[in-house]
Regions:
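Short hydrophobic/aromatic patch on the recognition helix
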Residues: 42-52
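Alpha-helical DNA-contacting segments of helix-turn-helix folds
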Residues: 52, 60-66, 73
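Basic, helix-initiating cap at the start of DNA-binding domains
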Residues: 1-27, 31-43, 56-60, 221, ...
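Amphipathic alpha-helical segments used for helix-helix packing
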Residues: 90, 104-130
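C-terminal effector-binding regulatory domain of bacterial HTH transcription factors
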Residues: 207-228
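Hydrophobic alpha-helical connector segments
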Residues: 61, 75-110, 162-169, 215-221
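Amphipathic C-terminal alpha-helical segment
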Residues: 101-104, 121, 145, 166-187, ...
Length: 228
């Protein structure tokens, strides 16, 4: 009986988080009340307070169910970039993986959209803002370490200070994803992301990566008539 009660409680918690995701995306965070979420989940407002302290606590729990693009990049480069065989390639791979997951995983895409386009940082949401800033700062600090390790490994001096380089890369990727979320059909997130990242890194002084040329159709040679 105890096991079933725990399972039911966990199912209710996930149901509330699922409902919150849907409503936050449709209405925005500030326009969605806890009662709205309870009704959408088919439960009571009291059930929400059993699992979450307030809307900010619920929001952070929703965020913790996915690994967002920034965190994907952070996790993909390890704790000690200087130990990596190829720090720059590890960074490229981590960014590519983050963009791929954003483009293909519906929940990741939905939560990132909510976190960047549907939330207003006021009142009880200040804790959410603090979490967002901490994630951003951690990502930029790690990116700076990777860029510096790559520059040291290749004997390069970056074109700009490493902190500025990390900030620029973060702003570019973050802005790229946000623009794609506004109109996913406007461009291919993964292909465009790969191109702009390689171009940006080349601008910092790293050797450029040869991009595959677009395929062109070969013209068929006209058949020659045999001479009589």
């Amino acid at each position: 009986m105890v096991r079933r009660t725990k399972a039911d409680a966990e199912a209710t918690r996930h149901s509330l988080l699922d409902a919150a995701e849907r409503l936050f995306q449709e209405r925005g965070v500030s326009r969605t009340s806890l009662n709205d979420i309870a009704v959408a989940a088919g439960t009571t407002r009291g059930a929400i307070y059993w699992h979450f302290r307030d809307k900010a606590d619920l929001f952070n729990a929703m965020m913790e169910r996915v690994v967002l693009p920034l965190e994907e990049t952070l996790n993909g480069t390890g704790k000690n970039p200087s130990d990596l065989e190829d720090p720059l390639q590890a960074l490229r791979d981590a960014i590519a993986h983050a963009l791929h997951k954003t483009a293909t995983d519906e929940r990741t895409r939905r939560v990132f959209e909510i976190a960047t386009l549907q939330v207003e940082y006021h009142d009880e949401m200040h804790a959410v803002r603090a979490r967002h800033l901490q994630g951003r700062n951690d990502c930029m600090q790690q990116t700076a370490k990777v860029l510096q390790s790559a520059a040291n490994q290749q004997g390069l001096t970056l074109a700009i200070p490493v902190q500025s380089a990390a900030l620029g890369l973060h702003v570019m990727i973050d802005g790229l994803i946000q623009n794609w979320l506004l109109d996913p059909k406007a461009f291919d997130l993964r292909r465009c992301g790969r191109q702009v990242v390689n171009t940006y890194l080349a601008g910092l002084g790293f050797p450029p990566v040869a991009l595959p040329r677009p395929r062109t159709r070969r013209m068929r040679q006209p058949l020659k008539l045999e001479e009589a």
